[in-house]
């Protein structure tokens, strides 16, 4: 089929042969609702476990710990972290293997400690998964029940001990104010 050239020419394309209702002239699709990049990052990023052991530093970072102290003594006016890092990197590159050896030994010891801590941490996670079979509400109910029993036992033992403790606490407060 022929295509139209110019404004006044008749269109003989497939679009021209379709009825007007079927044409997508002037119609736009609504933009798809996609989550923003920030939202997807937040969803993908897993929450960090505060009980997980911190990863062992490399030999360079062990060196950098010592280097920071000496660099700050020699250059008290330089406060930029990047300057300390750059100077430390240059010094590390210029050091021989013999000079790096003590830092590599410290890093190896820390790595061994980290691996032991991770083994213990992973064992605790495995043991913790057994407890997850119970619902958390049942666990909380058991804790609350045992706490109530302890309170009842204390009250039965006598209120004299609690009163003495409160008096001792009041005396401590008076000393802090002076």
From Swiss-Prot:
Coiled coil: none annotated. Residues 53-122 bind DNA. Residues 1-52, 101-118 have a biased composition (Basic and acidic residues). Disruption phenotype: Slightly delayed and reduced germination rate. Reduced root length. Enhanced sensitivity to methyl methanesulfonate (MMS). It holds the Pfam family HMG_box. Induction: Down-regulated by salt stress. GO terms for molecular function: chromatin binding; DNA binding; DNA-binding transcription factor activity; structural constituent of chromatin. Keywords: DNA-binding, Nucleus, Phosphoprotein. GO terms for cellular component: chromatin; nucleus. Binds preferentially double-stranded DNA. Modulates general plant growth and stress tolerance. Confers sensitivity to salt and genotoxic (methyl methanesulfonate, MMS) stresses. Belongs to the HMGB family. This is High mobility group B protein 1. It comes from Arabidopsis thaliana (Mouse-ear cress). The lineage of its organism: Eukaryota, Viridiplantae, Streptophyta, Embryophyta, Tracheophyta. The gene is HMGB1.
């Amino acid at each position: 089929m022929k295509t139209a050239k110019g404004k006044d020419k008749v269109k003989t394309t497939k679009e021209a042969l379709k009825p007007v209702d079927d044409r997508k002239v002037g119609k736009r699709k609504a933009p798809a609702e996609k989550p923003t990049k920030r939202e997807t990052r937040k969803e993908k990023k897993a929450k960090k476990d505060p009980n997980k052991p911190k990863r062992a530093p490399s030999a360079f970072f062990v060196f950098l710990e010592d280097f920071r102290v000496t660099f700050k003594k020699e250059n008290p006016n330089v406060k930029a972290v990047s300057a300390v890092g750059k100077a430390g990197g240059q010094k590390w590159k210029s050091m021989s293997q013999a000079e790096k050896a003590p830092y590599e030994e410290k890093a190896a010891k820390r790595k061994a400690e980290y691996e032991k801590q991770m083994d213990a941490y992973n064992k605790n996670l495995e043991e913790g998964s057994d407890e997850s079979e119970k619902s958390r509400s049942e666990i909380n109910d058991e804790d609350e029940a045992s706490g109530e029993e302890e309170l009842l036992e204390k009250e039965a033992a006598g209120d004299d001990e609690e009163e003495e403790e409160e008096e001792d606490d009041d005396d401590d407060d008076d000393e802090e104010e002076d």
